Each structure stands twice: as structure tokens, then as C-alpha cells.
Amino acid sequence: MFMTMKQNFYHLGIACAVAILVVYRINGLAFLLTLAATIALNDASSHYILKEGITRLRPCHVLPDLEMIIRCSNSFSFPSNHASNTFAAATLMSLCFRNTTFLAIAFALLVCYSRVYLKVHYPSDILGGAIYGSLIGYLCYRHIYTRILKFIKP
């Protein structure tokens, strides 16, 4: 449950952002700006276009006797935004900083596992979110990160 609650990551996120800026400097700044755009684009399109268009019910709505660990969300199930956002971020980070690939993907997989464990998503919701997020992460790397680097690097 720890892995699925956003408020558990605020301080860690700030610490990671500062560390990225200190270690990677200009590339770190370009990454953080691109990450903000990536998550905004991915989260909005995944929710408002895919979820609202596909309208797949969550397991807790289809199986009412399912014993829930956390409250069942009222939003639709496919794709998982947690999976989509973490894979978008992991893909972007892996492309920007090759030495972070294992850690980034491991974190994304852990978040994805938590969504199935908590019974709020089907495995196919996770797979769809991971694929979509990876695609968005790659496209943002190719079209946003590289342009930001050209703009801010002397």
C-alpha cells in the first residue's frame, strides 16, 4: 500500500529532484522540465482519452464480493494511470541517464505490482498502461528533452 499512495513520495521526489540537479546539472534541468511535461501529457491523455473512451470497470465493480485492501475508485480501470505515469517517467529517465535504467524500471514494476495486489486493476490494465507510458516517455524524450537541451546548453 505504501507504493501506491502519492503522499508517501513528496519528500523523496523533492530529494531526487535536487540530487538530479546537483549530479547532472544542465541535463538534470532538461530532464526535470521534460518529466513535468511528460507526466502532464501522459496523465491527462491516459485518463481523459483512454480511460473515458474505453470505460472498463475495475475489478471491485465487477466482483462486488472482492475483499478490498483500499477504497475502490470510481474511475475506470483501463489503462492504469499509475503504470502509465511510472513507465513514462522510467522510460524518460532511462533514455536521459543510461545508468539509471535498472532502478527506474524496478521502481515502475513495483508500483505496477502494487496495483494488482491491491485489486484495483487487472494485469491487462497494467500492461496497457506500461506500454502507453513507455511510448509517451520515448516520444517526450525525442521531441521535448532534445529541444530543451539545445535551448539551454551553450
How should these model regions be labeled?
Residues M1-A15, S46-S75, I152-P154:
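N-terminal transmembrane-helix/juxtamembrane module of multi-pass inner/ER membrane proteins
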Residues H11, A30, T34, N99-A106:
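Alpha-helical transmembrane segments of integral membrane proteins
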Residues G13-V23, T86-T91:
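Hydrophobic, aromatic-rich transmembrane alpha-helices
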Residues A17-A44:
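Interfacial segments of alpha-helical transmembrane regions
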Residues E67-P154:
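Membrane-embedded catalytic cores of phosphoryl/pyrophosphoryl-handling enzymes
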